[in-house]
Amino acid sequence: MIIRSPEPEVKILVDRDPIKTSFEEWAKPGHFSRTIAKGPDTTTWIWNLHADAHDFDSHTNDLEEISRKVFSAHFGQLSIIFLWLSGMYFHGARFSNYEAWLSDPTHIRPSAQVVWPIVGQEILNGDVGGGFRGIQITSGFFQIWRASGITNELQLYCTAIGALVFAALMLFAGWFHYHKAAPKLAWFQDVESMLNHHLTGLLGLGSLSWAGHQIHVSLPINQFLNAAVDPKEIPLPHEFILNRDLLAQLYPSFAEGATPFFTLNWSKYGEFLTFRGGLDPVTGGLWLTDIIHHHLAIAILFLIAGHMYRTNWGIGHSIKDILEAHKGPFTGQGHKGLYEILTTSWHAQLSINLAMLGSLTIVVAHHMYSMPPYPYLATDYGTQLSLFTHHMWIGGFLIVGAAAHAAIFMVRDYDPTIRYNDLLDRVLRHRDAIISHLNWVCIFLGFHSFGLYIHNDTMSALGRPQDMFSDTAIQLQPIFAQWIQNTHALAPGTTAPGAATSTSLTWGGENLVAVGGKVALLPIPLGTADFLVHHIHAFTIHVTVLILLKGVLFARSSRLIPDKANLGFRFPCDGPGRGGTCQVSAWDHVFLGLFWMYNSISVVIFHFSWKMQSDVWGSISDQGIVTHITGGNFAQSSITINGWLRDFLWAQASQVIQSYGSSLSAYGLFFLGAHFVWAFSLMFLFSGRGYWQELIESIVWAHNKLKVAPATQPRALSIVQGRAVGVTHYLLGGIATTWAFFLARIIAVG
């Protein structure tokens, strides 16, 4: 008889068929809430329906059920993303001039949308070159497609169909993992396993497979394209993958296969894994071989990182242990208890992730122009401006979202009775010191940064240019920024001996890369004008942080309202009996923070747009003389408020204002319409609820008189709803106005 040790029990981490699939239930509006499901008595019902549909906390208190809903919703989100991507690729296949652009990217502009002639709007189809008429696009898809080795429209069709299949698969997964096999709470809380799988699978294997694609497909195809080979003559991707000899003709080391890898003779791979720095002079993009090297290195890092956490094998890190060991001399219990917070409050988790992702998105915005990753991206000024602006806005919204969910965590999930002397508790206990100091910093930055401009406007108005802060009078050079630029420019040969050139041309030096007579990138000079506007950036960012952080730290209580936690995340005022307690809820801080986020990002994208047109973008003559779009006027014009209004806003708005009758006229209409949407927001922001309720009751009286009164009783928007509608139109109108202004300008002159 063989005596075996008992088999370890396999944990069952899913529930089978927990919730039945019922179209009848889903067809009933508000089925998730007993109150809303009763149907409308007043028009407030439709607002509550929208406010609570995705607020899973309000449907149930069961953390497992909430987790499953969030998990399922993520698949729905992925499905929409695949659907959107499919649409982009389909447009590229069906309505674009991609193949023409590929053959001549310096003279032909990308277009993937053709307007139908219905009421004469075919005027919007501009001549983008190569005999194609359509709307010029600025999304950067053409550049991405070229970089990844797509050479014809059939490949785009296939990818579009593939994305549709994935969209359907994601929808199925969302249904399956909620209705058929729903994970248990323990599965959502198993952070070590999650880290291992996400780091290894998504980031590690994802980067590795991308590096593989770039080596075997993108690199040879781009090599041929750069040598001006007709795309139709280039072998197809599968030929490079299946036939090693083809690659070996371009890169001889391929003939040796994996031998150099296993014999540690890695320098053999130096042909396609490089460390050049700078830009490829043919395309104005980063060297593809540098990008491949980067992805391979990232893959190795994350494959290692994805094996660091302790799961069934009893080796590796435990997150709880790491957090609890994290104590400093001044931090009391340190991170003790943080593990419990982050595994039971998805708002806390989401808040951190949004803050990180928002910051990362802004980092991406800055790298897209300083290290343009795709071929012919740097000379497509419209796309450069669009990508910067887009990523800045997205980053701003994500960071405000981080504060919103941090505050929701404080109100709904934070339990002060079990938190004592840990890091969060200590921050909350000296929140007055934090907020009052931050307030002082905001006042200091505001008066000094704005004061420098006011000084310049005054001196300029009085005809005393010699007394202004400028590069030609009283200089305020950004010496620290210049030192950083210089350090990076000199890095090759000193701190980075392996690199041929510095990471970005913007750092300085003599280099200039021009493609097809247009500047791709050159060293960006920083002077007094940049010093001034950078302090405006510091000011607006600090005020945004002040508002958002105050909202988080005072979300549960304050001297004014000690029992704020009982009032919830959003409330208009503390009851009718207490005056002066309006706009104190955590939600109101998010509301106010959004306006300052809008201020911050607006100044950043204005700075970028003007600086690049003035000091970087332009044409280069055969003699090597660069002519910038606005002729280098940033340094002298942007040092006064008047200069910003006159030489940036007014001077550069001429293209959008004069666009009627041209292919840019849609931007003129959008410019007008978006101004209207923005102005419409003020109606919601400047008037009180009572005004509208009074008006509505008068209108209802008239309907009753005519016997056409509706069964659902009309109600004015609540105070919070009015603010929500107001801020939405304010931001939407403002962003769309800026979008029309930027694009009409840069498409006309770029």
Swiss-Prot record:
Keyword Iron: yes
EC number assigned by the record: 1.97.1.12
Annotated phylloquinone binding sites: W692
Catalytic activity field: reduced [plastocyanin] + hnu + oxidized [2Fe-2S]-[ferredoxin] = oxidized [plastocyanin] + reduced [2Fe-2S]-[ferredoxin]
Entry annotated with the keyword Magnesium: yes
Compartmental location: Plastid, Chloroplast thylakoid membrane
Cofactor note (record): P700 is a chlorophyll a/chlorophyll a' dimer, A0 is one or more chlorophyll a, A1 is one or both phylloquinones and FX is a shared 4Fe-4S iron-sulfur center.
Positions of transmembrane segments: 70-93, 156-179, 195-219, 291-309, 346-369, 385-411, 433-455, 531-549, 589-610, 664-686, 724-744
GO CC term (a single one): chloroplast thylakoid membrane
Residues the entry annotates as binding [4Fe-4S] cluster: C573, C582
UniProt GO BP: photosynthesis
Residues binding chlorophyll a, per UniProt: M683, Y691
Record-listed chlorophyll a' binding positions: H675
SUPFAM superfamilies: Photosystem I subunits PsaA/PsaB (SSF81558)
NCBIfam families xrefs: psaA
Protein name: Photosystem I P700 chlorophyll a apoprotein A1
Gene of this entry: psaA
